[in-house]
Amino acid sequence: MSEIPGDLKFLKSHEWARVESDGRVTVGISDHAQGLLGDLVYVELPGVGDTVQVGNGAAVVESVKAASDVYSPVSGTVVEVNSALSDKPETINEDAYGEGWIFVVEIDDKEQLNDLLDPDDYAELLEDDDH
């Protein structure tokens, strides 16, 4: 398993959130999640301007094995999507924490970030899943 970046926060459902310098939040799925799904073949992105709610489905990733909702770790408005994933969904498999980001949210309430798991807690969750 790859190293979990220290600047990310996580949902228990394996989505990550990274607060950018402008206060917006970039969202993707964890390296663990992409590994469970296998080779991704399709990503259904939210629309720019869509309102997303914390814990609700905002996107869908599909692999040859399964389709999985991508839940938003924060509430707000989608301000950017990674349209490159339409042509190359496997980017998530190759770089889940970098080029494989899925969408960016203008967050409504920064306090929501405090409810997310930090990298150590997320690593602990993964260890518990393995037992």
From Swiss-Prot:
The modification N6-lipoyllysine is found at K65. Its cofactor is (R)-lipoate. Coiled coil: none annotated. The keyword RNA-binding does not apply. CDD domains: GCS_H. Gene3D superfamilies: 2.40.50.100. GO terms for biological process: glycine decarboxylation via glycine cleavage system. The keyword Amino-acid biosynthesis does not apply. InterPro entries: 2-oxoA_DH_lipoyl-BS, Biotin_lipoyl, GCV_H, GCV_H/Fam206, GCV_H_sub, Single_hybrid_motif. One of its GO terms (cellular component) is glycine cleavage complex. Binds 1 lipoyl cofactor covalently. Residues 24-106 form the Lipoyl-binding domain. Keywords: Lipoyl. The glycine cleavage system catalyzes the degradation of glycine. The H protein shuttles the methylamine group of glycine from the P protein to the T protein. Belongs to the GcvH family. The glycine cleavage system is composed of four proteins: P, T, L and H. NCBIfam families: gcvH, PRK01202.1. This is Glycine cleavage system H protein. It comes from Xanthomonas euvesicatoria pv. vesicatoria (strain 85-10) (Xanthomonas campestris pv. vesicatoria).
